[in-house]
Amino acid sequence: MPQISRFFGIVIYMYAKDHFPPHFHAMYGEEEAMIDIKSKQIINGQLSKRALKLVKEWAKLHEDELLYNFKEAQKPIPDFKLIDPLD
């Protein structure tokens, strides 16, 4: 599970050859959620309101990069790119 970003204690990562729809995973402490890249909604899991707000804000800024990484995740040897954290 390559880490692609980290900010305010939130870790963002993707799995290679993960299933559709395009999504990423966010972990904050003991909480973990799978987030749809397009809608920015939780598909599975949970995050606190504060963490989810930060994740959605970050995902809006980096949607193209997230989609690139998800496309890479489908390849036999993915080339994940690190994405800048939320400032």
Regions found by a protein language model. Name each.
Residues 1, 37, 41-49, 75-87:
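N-terminus-biased detector of the onset of the functional/mature region
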Residues 1-22:
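Short, charged/polar N-terminal "headpieces" of proteins
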Residues 2-9, 30-32, 57, 61, ...:
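Multi-pass alpha-helical transmembrane bundles in non-GPCR membrane proteins
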Residues 11-13, 34, 82:
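Generic structural signal for residues positioned in beta-strands
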Residues 15-49:
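A short, structured beta-strand/loop element
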Residues 37-38, 42, 52-53, 64-69:
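Short alpha-helical interface patches
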Residues 47-50, 54, 59:
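Short interaction-prone segments
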Residues 56-87:
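C-terminal structural segments of small proteins and small subunits
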